[in-house]
């Protein structure tokens, strides 16, 4: 199972301030605990500001074919928006980001793991369920899974010709992130301080 938890309200409003926003809710996998009431309350507050171009609630946006069919019905409202805010697990956010190449796509939730079935996650998108989602700083490409070293503060010095030094068949995750941020005009995100990933266990935090 997965648990999705809303990011801090301040973190979300800092992304949406002064922007037109299209919102996507995923109520898909029964294996995912989604904070519906909290999400609805926050979305109502955002809509009250008059900057929400539309809200789409669907299921299984981690399935690219299903997601594409659903999004096509809302494309005019999506094109009006400066930012697409996705309330889902990390895989859903990555799937939407890959499809909407010219849009800034942001995660409204962090994802946490619970042992058990993991839903219908396609293999080409991965979420490590780290509870500290970095997708908003990396253009919707997860540095934890796209980089073989799970680096969150930029490229290492070992990549060569765009390939990873650990796996020469693997494209450098941070080169992908750079290209994506350049494409959506967000290279400034690379200058922002990075919250280093916390690998401490629950027992160590007690």
Where are these regions (language model features)?
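N-terminal glycine-rich "phosphate-gripper" loop used for MgATP/nucleotide binding
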Residues: 86-90
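Short, well-ordered alpha-helical microsegments
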Residues: 92-95
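Iron-sulfur (Fe-S) cluster-binding modules
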Residues: 1-62, 71-84, 97-137, 141-206
